[in-house]
């Protein structure tokens, strides 16, 4: 089965290719009555669209969203919401030299192995432009969650060897890298200039902090909340690893260091630390959820690379076209969107976890 849908209760299906006529998504399960406009969605899409700085692809796309269904007089109707963004600046001719070549770091070979056929123009469904549907849907989920007091703070934690040393939330939108540290952003720019001069690319780390999530979301076995979030974020093409809370560092800690203690504050149960990152036993504990996504370097580089063709010839390949030297800044909102979709789906699933919750919904 070709899986292009995410979620069980708040379901999103993305469609379209990088060089097709359009891309988009269909959302099924959004409740009626949510105030929603194209402007709400456009704010999210503008954070990932190309051409925002010299460190992103020169492809000029407005990425203007159209709501085709599911909204009437500014409110969601409870029926499927169809969202579309038209492609306007494709240059398929840039990909003529790779029609039969397997680009290192791309999905060309694996698509051929699976389907026996592939759309080589920009990678088709494996292109980063597929995330347009995710981001548009994530904007809807984020607005719904905001109405429930759940918010996100997502930013670039590092690019290549350059990591943030300070955290100023107001700085995130003041630089091209969405870094909460102006000094680190300047150093990242210098590092990327060297990468570009060497016809190379860079990766990095994105951190997402989610506040306001109530205790109780997720399940104890196969649909753990951390597993749902990890699946959501790992489904992003450039992401190679995800960690929650202290992540891989817990392997080097003692139990006395890793365990989060509990205390009572204002008649509420609180934790004295948050090494678990807001999730214990697969279930949210009410504290801030902290997730990090590790993003690989952009595989499209201009350096000659050794590869083979689908006919079995060994060749040296130079990739031309318009490509990002680093995808991390544009992926920040993609990570946030996928987290929003996962939290929304878990929230809806949790509405039937207890009889008293069902009785509260249907009380006369």
What are these regions (language model features)?
Residues 300-364:
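Internal helix-turn-beta structural module
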Residues 21-33, 128-150, 223, 227-231, ...:
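Alpha-helical support elements that line or immediately flank enzyme active sites
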Residues 44-104, 108:
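Glycine-rich, N-terminal phosphate-binding loop and its surrounding beta-alpha-beta segment
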Residues 113-221:
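Glycine-rich, mobile lid/loop segments that gate access to catalytic sites or pores
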Residues 15, 21, 199-202, 206-314:
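Glycine-rich anion/phosphate-binding loop at the beta-strand->alpha-helix junction
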Residues 99-124, 305-323:
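Short acidic, glycine/tyrosine-flanked loop/strand segments centered on an H-E-D-like triad
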Residues 1-59:
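N-terminal, positively charged regions that mediate nucleic acid binding
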Residues 11-16, 119-130, 215-219, 274-279, ...:
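A short glycine/serine-rich beta->alpha loop
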């Amino acid at each position: 089965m070709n899986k292009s849908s995410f979620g069980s209760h708040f379901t999103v299906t993305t469609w379209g290719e990088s060089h097709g006529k359009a891309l988009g998504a269909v959302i099924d399960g959004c409740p009626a009555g949510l105030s929603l406009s194209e402007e709400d969605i456009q704010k999210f899409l503008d954070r990932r669209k190309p051409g925002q700085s010299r460190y992103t692809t020169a492809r000029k796309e407005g990425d203007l969203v159209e709501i085709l269904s599911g909204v009437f007089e500014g409110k969601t109707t409870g029926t499927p919401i169809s969202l579309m963004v038209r492609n306007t600046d494709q240059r398929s001719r840039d990909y003529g030299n790779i029609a039969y070549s397997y680009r290192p770091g791309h999905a060309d070979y694996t698509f051929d192995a699976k389907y026996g056929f592939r759309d080589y123009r920009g990678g088709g469904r494996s292109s980063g432009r597929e995330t347009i549907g995710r981001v548009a849907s994530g904007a809807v989920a984020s607005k719904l969650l905001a109405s429930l007091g759940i918010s996100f703070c997502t930013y670039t934690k590092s690019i290549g060897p350059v990591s943030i040393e300070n955290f100023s939330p107001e700085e995130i939108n003041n630089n091209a890298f969405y870094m909460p540290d102006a000094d680190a952003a300047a150093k990242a720019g210098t590092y990327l200039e060297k990468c570009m001069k060497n016809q190379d690319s860079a990766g990095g780390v994105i951190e997402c902090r989610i506040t306001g999530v109530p205790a109780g979301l997720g399940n104890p076995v196969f649909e753990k909340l951390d597993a749902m979030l990890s699946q959501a974020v790992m489904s992003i093409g450039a992401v190679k690893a995800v960690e929650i809370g202290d992540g891989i560092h817990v392997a080097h800690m003692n139990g006395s260091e890793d365990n989060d203690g509990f205390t009572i504050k204002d008649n509420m149960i609180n934790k004295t630390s948050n090494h678990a990152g807001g999730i214990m036993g697969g279930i949210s504990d009410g504290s801030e959820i902290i997730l990090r996504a590790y993003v690989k370097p952009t595989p499209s580089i201009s350096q000659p690379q050794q590869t083979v063709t689908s006919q079995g010839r060994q060749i040296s390949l130079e990739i031309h076209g318009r490509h990002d030297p680093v995808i991390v800044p544009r992926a920040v909102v993609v990570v946030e969107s996928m987290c929003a979709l996962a939290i929304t789906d878990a929230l809806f699933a949790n509405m039937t976890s207890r009889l008293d919750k069902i009785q509260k919904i249907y009380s006369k």
